[in-house]
């Protein structure tokens, strides 16, 4: 059995609206539509601010940078993440000077294997400063159990 990595979820209506926007707008980034989207997203997610970026890769880099700066995480600190993830989850960890620690995957939900997570937490005790929980392939990780 094979599963497609992703299916095209963009409808013809979406394509039409996007092409109309491109043809009639002189600003594609940081314009009024982006600010309106950020505001609407903040309202929906019940957060004070939102920042729209071009990709999940950029979002991961921005998130890792912001969290490590906010909590004053020193370089070379260990950040735990799943072994089953995209390179764009791991790349910001390395790019920003941190050390990734990989947790095995529970094949039932493609999230952390809880027994391995416990083993790693005992092995590294206070060394792991951040747990980066990827929600792989649209599957929501059960973060409340971590």
Model regions: which residues?
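Active-site phosphate-binding strand-loop segment of PLP-dependent enzymes
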Residues: 108-146
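Generic structural signal for small/hydrophobic residues in well-ordered secondary structure
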Residues: 18-19, 41, 59, 79, ...
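A short beta-strand submotif of the Rossmann-like class I SAM-dependent methyltransferase core
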Residues: 52-55, 81, 130-133
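Pocket-edge positions in alpha/beta enzyme catalytic cores
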Residues: 7, 25-29, 102-104, 109, ...
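Conserved PLP-anchoring active-site segment centered on the Schiff-base-forming lysine
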Residues: 64-123
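Glycine-rich phosphate-binding loop at the start of an alpha helix
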Residues: 53, 57, 87, 111, ...
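Conserved PLP-binding active-site segment in aminotransferase class I/II-type PLP enzymes
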Residues: 1-74
